């Protein structure tokens, strides 16, 4: 996130169009792509600091959200990864889960690697981790049909 005063300074001093700032910030501004799955795939084959930063920032934001939820519900038994990034990137899952090792959350690295639906945590992990593939568009369609 940005300090709100930065936007005013950029506009007044640098004449930066704020709509362009929003359009070209985030993953796109860091890496030239807004597709995190493509960024993670490209980062496997090369060492690009901006790609690494984008991945780390994404994982940090997810870790903050999950950590906050865990503290509010006073514990966790299961973390489920779904959606494009959740099911498509073993690297993202590994990085996110690493932050929660203090909860005795341990991934089974072989299961995590193959992106198969089911439990991907180590059998001795206190907190289980699951991978669930869904057709997001089909799920959205089901919800929308309830309103028609």
What are these regions, as identified by a protein language model?
Residues 3-4, 14, 51, 55-59, ...:
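Generic structural signal for well-ordered, non-membrane alpha-helical segments
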């Amino acid at each position: 996130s940005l300090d709100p005063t930065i936007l005013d300074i950029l506009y007044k001093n640098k004449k930066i169009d704020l709509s362009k700032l929003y359009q070209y910030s985030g993953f796109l501004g860091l890496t030239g792509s807004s597709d995190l799955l493509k960024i993670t795939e490209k980062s496997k084959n090369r060492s690009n600091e901006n790609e690494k930063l984008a991945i780390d920032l994404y994982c940090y934001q997810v870790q903050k959200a999950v950590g906050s939820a865990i503290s509010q519900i006073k514990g966790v038994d299961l973390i489920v990864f779904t959606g494009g990034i959740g099911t498509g990137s073993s690297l993202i899952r590994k990085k996110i889960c690493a932050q929660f090792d203090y909860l005795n959350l341990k991934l089974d690295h072989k299961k995590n690697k193959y992106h198969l639906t089911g439990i991907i945590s180590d059998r001795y992990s206190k907190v289980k981790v699951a991978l669930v593939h869904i057709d997001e568009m089909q799920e959205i369609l089901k919800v929308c049909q309830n309103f028609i």
